[in-house]
């Protein structure tokens, strides 16, 4: 998205092979735009050769104006990365997190410059999906917030301001939607039936295909993080965790609820993904499948 908007981009990966794979994925996405006539060959060449730098060295970020962190959804990992960014990036550089759920205030507190820290949460795939959540932490400076919205406009996104809360806006809504789908699976439906019904109704994708696209490890990390405070009567499916425990995180690993051939975004149902689904919680809830209304959420997510 940033390349298409005319920005120079520095991409940091952990290892050389991962860096080259990332470059290949970006080139693949841009080649699609080239084939559709959205960009010229000259622009494609400039974006993939001149405007894009791929590195495994954080020092490559020393002169950038804004960094968007998009590492694994784990607070310890996030803090480690922000510590490195804090040490390397120039004074005044904005440090943004693409976190889906985590506390941006806590991330900001791990740096010496909390006023420069903000959440910029994109939705998958980031070069297509329009929504951008601009998550304002307690100490985020007003000019940093303004820059977040300016970036969203430059990227042709619909930017919304969000407060610091679990899942912000989009994922709080999605969580209730996904809970309903999980309860249907516990009651005997398959993920593939649910996805098909929603696509037939007019949705671009069903919730399980969306999970594969975003990465099943994100939801897995969230479920583990919330386990200690979960109500004992809550109906919690175990089949998504079993998929993740097998190392299957969706499109990024080639297998999740669906199986994906190399280079393909379309998958075929993975029957083994639900072979061990559990109905152990069927009798544990007397709610009859009713879900808490979104309006009943106590903590505000808008500012």
Predicted regions and their residues:
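N-terminal glycine-rich phosphate-binding loop for ADP-containing cofactors
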Residues: 1-303
């Amino acid at each position: 998205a940033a390349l298409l908007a005319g920005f120079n981009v520095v991409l940091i990966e952990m290892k050389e092979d991962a860096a080259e794979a990332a470059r290949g994925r970006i080139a693949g996405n841009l080649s699609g735009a080239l084939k559709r006539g959205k960009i010229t060959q000259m622009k494609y060449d400039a974006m993939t050769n001149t405007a894009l730098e791929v590195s495994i060295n954080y020092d490559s970020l020393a002169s950038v104006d804004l960094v968007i962190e998009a590492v694994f959804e784990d607070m310890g990992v996030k803090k480690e990365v922000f510590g490195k960014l804090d040490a390397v990036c120039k004074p005044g550089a904005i440090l943004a997190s693409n976190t889906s759920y985590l506390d941006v205030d806590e991330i900001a507190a791990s740096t010496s410059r909390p006023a420069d820290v903000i959440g910029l949460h994109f939705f998958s795939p980031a070069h297509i999906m329009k929504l951008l959540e601009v998550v304002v932490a307690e100490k985020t400076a007003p000019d940093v917030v303004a820059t977040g919205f300016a970036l969203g406009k430059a990227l042709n996104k619909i930017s919304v301001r969000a407060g610091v809360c679990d899942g912000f806006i989009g994922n709080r809504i999605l969580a209730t939607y996904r809970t309903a789908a999980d309860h249907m699976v516990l009651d005997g439906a398959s993920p593939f039936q649910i996805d098909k019904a929603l696509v037939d109704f007019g949705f671009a994708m069903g919730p399980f295909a969306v999970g594969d696209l975003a990465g099943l490890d994100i939801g897995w990390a969230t479920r583990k993080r919330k386990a200690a405070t979960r109500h004992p009567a809550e109906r919690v499916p175990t089949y998504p965790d079993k998929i993740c425990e097998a190392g299957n995180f969706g499109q990024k690993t080639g297998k999740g609820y669906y199986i994906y051939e190399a280079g393909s975004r379309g998958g075929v149902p993975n029957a083994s993904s639900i072979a061990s689904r559990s109905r152990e919680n069927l009798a544990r809830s007397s709610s009859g499948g009713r879900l808490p209304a979104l309006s009943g959420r106590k903590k505000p997510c808008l500012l």
